[in-house]
């Protein structure tokens, strides 16, 4: 008998080409993490998200995910609002006009530094938009103490709070497995004949769907 578990297909096909997505993952249980992150990235690309618009950051463990997601979201707004001059720290290229340092009364001049191509500063792939969604990926495997329960509950509540406080979808990609094999199967790398299913694929689909819907809802557009 086939399982009834799993999400139904989305009601529409979503185009991720205009989206910018962040992945924040822990480094505990690296074998499983690597498979999940790979599955997530592959799905995002299949949904049209450009590789240059996928940013991957890591933290030590799952407990650090909520803070990291919050900081990544706020930092992307800083990036999007920054000008080329902001990101270059106010340096001037190819000009004799000095700039004054905030930490020293002496003028700072970079007039001797040639600009790339000789025509002015060039910034490759300067971000122009904040993140439309963040995918938090972690792997918690129950051990002999209550550590598993405390971390699972704390991280779950904190990630929910991040998305409610910021208005940016945070996809819950934290596996809470009772055994090593459960974790491996949920990353599609089980040791048995049935390798399981890589949940990173589901998280990639959810990120594109929620990011697209959030944009639409923010504009007051709803399905008829």
Predicted regions and their residues:
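N-terminal presequence-like segments and the immediate start of the first folded domain
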Residues: 1-20, 106-107, 111-117, 191-195, ...
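Glycine-rich phosphate/diphosphate-binding loop of Rossmann-like nucleotide-binding domains
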Residues: 11-64
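Short, ordered loop/turn segments at secondary-structure junctions
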Residues: 27-28, 59, 139-140, 174-179
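Charged, often glycine-rich, active-site loop that binds/positions anionic groups
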Residues: 66-80
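Intrinsically disordered, low-complexity domain-flanking/linker segments in eukaryotic proteins
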Residues: 76-129
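Structural motif
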Residues: 132-133
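C-terminal binding/interaction regions
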Residues: 137, 146-224
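Short glycine-rich, flexible loops that bind phosphorylated cofactors or substrates
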Residues: 142-144
């Amino acid at each position: 008998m086939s399982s009834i578990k799993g999400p139904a297909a989305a009601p529409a096909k979503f185009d991720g080409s205009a989206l910018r997505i962040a992945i924040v993952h822990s480094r505990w249980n690296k074998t499983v993490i690597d498979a999940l992150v790979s599955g997530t990235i592959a799905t995002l690309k299949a949904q049209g998200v450009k590789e240059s618009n996928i940013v991957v950051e890591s933290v030590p463990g799952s407990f650090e995910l909520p803070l990291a997601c919050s900081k990544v979201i706020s930092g992307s707004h800083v990036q999007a609002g920054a000008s080329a001059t902001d990101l270059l720290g106010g340096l001037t290229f190819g000009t004799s006009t000095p700039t004054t340092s905030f930490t020293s009364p002496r003028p700072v001049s970079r007039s001797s530094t040639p600009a790339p191509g000789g025509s002015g500063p060039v910034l490759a792939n300067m971000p122009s938009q904040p993140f439309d969604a963040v995918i938090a990926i972690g792997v918690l495997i129950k051990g002999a103490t209550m550590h598993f329960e405390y971390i699972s509950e704390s991280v779950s509540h904190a990630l929910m709070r991040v998305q409610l406080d910021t208005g940016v979808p945070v996809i819950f990609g934290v596996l809470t497995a009772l055994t090593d094999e459960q974790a491996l199967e949920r990353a599609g790398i089980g040791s048995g004949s049935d390798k399981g299913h890589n949940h990173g694929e589901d998280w990639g689909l959810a990120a594109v769907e929620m990011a697209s819907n959030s944009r639409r809802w923010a504009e007051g557009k709803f399905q008829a």
